[in-house]
Amino acid sequence: MSLDKGTKEEITKKFQLHEKDTGSADVQIAILTEHITELKEHLKRSPKDQNSRLALLKLVGQRRKLLEYLNSTDTERYKNLISRLNLRK
């Protein structure tokens, strides 16, 4: 259940801070959000898939930590990212 290269590149271009930015918190959070969305859809089709459920929980935890980091370092970027990704906070 991983994202294909084209999807990752598209997300990276949309959320990068500068031309060669591939690892900023914004990009990482956006990629994790897309992956979480795909896993949620998979779990709707396969509710007994416990490995995917655990992977989903792990990804949500990673995203939460990155969001906390971004909020503590740059609150304005955090608020902008939350609104762009339609995350509730």
Swiss-Prot record:
Coiled-coil regions, chain positions = none
The biological process GO terms on file are: translation
What terms describe the molecular function in GO for this protein? rRNA binding; structural constituent of ribosome
Keyword tags: Ribonucleoprotein, Ribosomal protein, RNA-binding, rRNA-binding
Domain of life of the organism encoding this protein: Bacteria
Instruction: Extract the InterPro entries matched here.
Output: Ribosomal_uS15 (IPR000589), Ribosomal_uS15_bac-type (IPR005290), uS15_NS1_RNA-bd_sf (IPR009068)
SUPFAM superfamilies reported for this sequence: S15/NS1 RNA-binding domain
Keyword Cell inner membrane listed? The answer is: no
GO CC, sorted alphabetically, is: cytosolic small ribosomal subunit
Summary of the function given for this chain in its UniProt record? One of the primary rRNA binding proteins, it binds directly to 16S rRNA where it helps nucleate assembly of the platform of the 30S subunit by binding and bridging several RNA helices of the 16S rRNA. Forms an intersubunit bridge (bridge B4) with the 23S rRNA of the 50S subunit in the ribosome.
User: What does the sequence similarity comment in the record state about its family?
Assistant: Belongs to the universal ribosomal protein uS15 family.
Subunit description = Part of the 30S ribosomal subunit. Forms a bridge to the 50S subunit in the 70S ribosome, contacting the 23S rRNA.
Q: What's this protein's name?
A: Small ribosomal subunit protein uS15
